[in-house]
Amino acid sequence: MTSSSTQVLPIKRKVLAAVATLTIVCGVSAAATGVASAASPQCAERCISVFSSELGSYDQLNFVEAVLGDGGARIGQPVGLKRANKFDPTQDIKPDGPLPYSTVADFFAAGMVSAEANQHYGHLQAVQQKYAPFNIDTDLCVGLASVKQNEGLTLQPCNVPGTTVWVVQMDLATPSGYFPIVNAATTDFRRPFSMHLPRNEVASGRPLQMQARHLQFLTDENTLRARQLWGAWAGELP
């Protein structure tokens, strides 16, 4: 095996571990050793942490997905990024779906996504992100109140079709294992609505609420901005 092949293998494992983490609770992979995530001790390996490639990496997550404000389990509560903290239950978010390793086709069979979304994304893995502070399940998931440009991510009832289902678009993943996360309620399949970290949120120092924005490709159809590329990890901060 060549040295270049040896370097590629850990990256490939990292990509596979990332998508597995987001679609089903899993243990720490050999793809990125020495890293853990931001679930509370009560949630431990049952929870996931989504992080932005703009602000962190698999070696240092820094900021992770969380319920903002007072962390109350209420419809419309904003969802964004907080500094990773194992004692913060607002960072306890569980992956959920009709089946382990659910695909968009599985969500379609459950009546949770449209036929159009299934036609375009049916083979891709998908997930709901259920809010579970201290490992206590709520009936609220990360979603959108409406599907439009710059709509903030908020808690929505998990039984709402489309807007609470997220497609893990690994066909656009980077070699380092970061990928876009597309909302299944999108109707523009060339530039679908995806998780986005607004630059003004980072610059202002305010809570980092995530938004839905059309995918913004750079020089070619396969290059995305770091603000629309995400990683995921399972477990508890040491």
Where are these regions (language model features)?
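Short helix-loop boundary/capping segments
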Residues: V147-T163
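Extracellular glycan-recognition/adhesion modules and their associated mucin-like linkers
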Residues: A39-Q149, V167-Q209, T219-P238
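Secretory targeting and sorting signals
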Residues: M1-A38
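Intrinsically disordered, low-complexity regions enriched in Ser/Pro/Gly/Gln/His and often acidic
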Residues: T33, N159, T223-A226
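Aromatic-rich beta-strand patches that line glycan-recognition/binding surfaces
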Residues: V79, G152-P157, R213-L215
